[in-house]
Amino acid sequence: MKLSACIVVYNGYDEALKAAQTVLRFTRRHPLTLYLVDNASPDGSGQKLEAALHSGLLAAGEGQQVVVRCRTENGGFGTGHNMVLPELDSDYHFILNPDIQLTADTLSDLADWMEQHPDVVMARPALVFPDGRPQQLPLRRCALRPMVYRQLPALRFWAKYNDAYL
């Protein structure tokens, strides 16, 4: 089973480098192509990622490949991810944020789970803060008020609504 993943970067070389390194370090069970797409970062993130690739900072392991693409204009997060779609020959593709930090072979685990559940077309892992607390995401009904309330821990009455997202 072949995997691919894409991280879109805008002015975030250090963060994207760490994310890419954890993806490469932990994704070992299945072949992986990791795409890093720079969205025309004025800080030179794209060129820095290319240099990291050539210097070995983004060292691909056995069965892994790293591809850096630099866009000439910032078309946004979706456009950056869509850029790689024509190149894909993977069985499963992952859209990753540049702040992701893997601590296990999560991509292989998700792909294996998807393989065992062919009726499912999309999945995501549980997201946690560095201290292990779950991150609340507005995945069911995205509205401004709940998004604001989730940021205010003093509003304990809102906890029931937050629990619906776990």
Where are the regions that the model predicts?
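Short, flexible, basic/aromatic active-site loop/helix in glycosyltransferases
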Residues: 142-166
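Short, acidic, metal-binding catalytic loop of nucleotide-sugar glycosyltransferases
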Residues: 22-31
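Cell-envelope/extracellular polymer assembly enzymes that use nucleotide-activated donors
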Residues: 2-4, 33
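Glycine-rich, basic loop-to-helix element that forms the pyrophosphate-binding segment
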Residues: 70-88
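Short beta-strand/loop segment that forms part of the nucleotide-sugar
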Residues: 31-40, 69-71
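Conserved donor NDP-sugar-binding/catalytic core segment of glycosyltransferases
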Residues: 103-137
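A conserved acidic beta->alpha catalytic loop
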Residues: 22, 38-49
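Short aromatic/hydrophobic "clamp" motif used to bind/position activated sugar donors
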Residues: 93
